[in-house]
Amino acid sequence: MPPYPAVRIPAKAAHTATVIFLHGLGDSGAGWMFLAEEARKAQRLNHVKFIFPEAPQQPVSLNFGMRMPSWYDIKELANVNAAQDQEGILESVGRLESLIKEETDAGVPANRIVIGGFSQGCAVSLATGCLTQTKLGGIVGLSGYVPIKDYILSQHNTTNQDTPMFLAHGTADQVIRFDYGKLSRDFIINELKFKNVDWHQYEGLTHSCGFEEISDILNWLEENIKE
């Protein structure tokens, strides 16, 4: 299975780590290039290659069946646990795993690879972190949730239980409600037994990524995939 197309930003120095970050519903990989640009402007994480995959164009029930960039179908946001597209989610997990393999085949150790995403991309990244048997360097989940919880609870393994995880959510998020973020955090810690979860909540932040959050992410990346 070939990986999805992606925006790839090479490391400025010797390439020893990779960040793979998935955008949200209706967005694009280019829409998250600012993470790499902020790091480059500050001369930070020069050893890191950034990959921003592009979701395929597909019909989305929430959008009246119209085609848009989407990692899986979404029927409603009022209850993110209702009628989930398990097949589509697992297909995107497989695509993300193929991107991880692309990097390990190129010589980057898996424990120097961080996966992450925003909103729908967060859901795919969290599912991947729970299900993969590859030991990762870190997992970043922004303004999202753990999807297909029953499946993940029955199929997850302990490979990444002590892998550093950065979870963040805005308190004023009206798309993926803040409560869903907290419930997912609690599920990850209490049910899946992840031991190294770094939780951040941002007062007044809507369904977006703020400057304070960007700074916190870059600091966290520097700490967990040191040069």
UniProtKB/Swiss-Prot annotation:
Its EC number is 3.1.2.-, 3.1.2.22. The active site is at 119 (charge relay system), 173 (charge relay system), 207 (charge relay system). It catalyses: S-hexadecanoyl-L-cysteinyl-[protein] + H2O = L-cysteinyl-[protein] + hexadecanoate + H(+). Gene3D superfamilies: alpha/beta hydrolase. InterPro entries: AB_hydrolase_fold, LYPA1-2/EST-like, PLipase/COase/thioEstase. One of its GO terms (molecular function) is palmitoyl-(protein) hydrolase activity. Transmembrane segments: none annotated. GO terms for cellular component: cytoplasm; nucleus. It is found in: Cytoplasm; Nucleus. Disulfide bonds: none annotated. Belongs to the AB hydrolase superfamily. AB hydrolase 2 family. This is Acyl-protein thioesterase 1. It comes from Yarrowia lipolytica (strain CLIB 122 / E 150) (Yeast).
